[in-house]
């Protein structure tokens, strides 16, 4: 039996601290959810074979709409992080193809990767990190070293990440 769903009525009530830090309820309608999903799908291709790792709490608006409802709408697999402290372990364990993250998490991952690359880079190239940005330095390294770095970074992300979806805050 088909059930009529009003596109403008509240569909889900999510609690968030938003930008003020004080908890409040956010009412999302069917239209709100569908607009978010359709807009995202206009930019990225989510496949049934995709696996994602849910890192943020499900009551987080961004997590609920993009990493839960969107992925379920495409028939994708959702895995769940044991805790924020175990995200790195869970990424290698579940080998996600898509990571839906907030900028703070991406910055944390970036910092960890950059530090590891700097520490393990051959001595003769370490001075480049002092002179150039991380991206510029990587571009100046020999192709074989760039490939080795890329392979290790990909492996640290479970070996299958093809897409990061970043949102819910400014990315600088």
Where are these regions (language model features)?
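Conserved pre-ATP/AMP-binding loop-to-beta segment of ANL
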Residues: 1-15, 22, 45-51
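Short aromatic/basic micro-patch
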Residues: 4, 27, 100
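Conserved AMP-binding A3 loop
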Residues: 11-37
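Conserved G/P- and acidic residue-centered "switch" motifs that form tight phosphate/ATP-binding loops
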Residues: 18-19, 75, 168
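Alpha-helix/helix-capping structural signal
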Residues: 31, 104, 169-170
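Conserved AMP-binding/adenylation subdomain of ANL enzymes
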Residues: 34-51, 58-147, 160
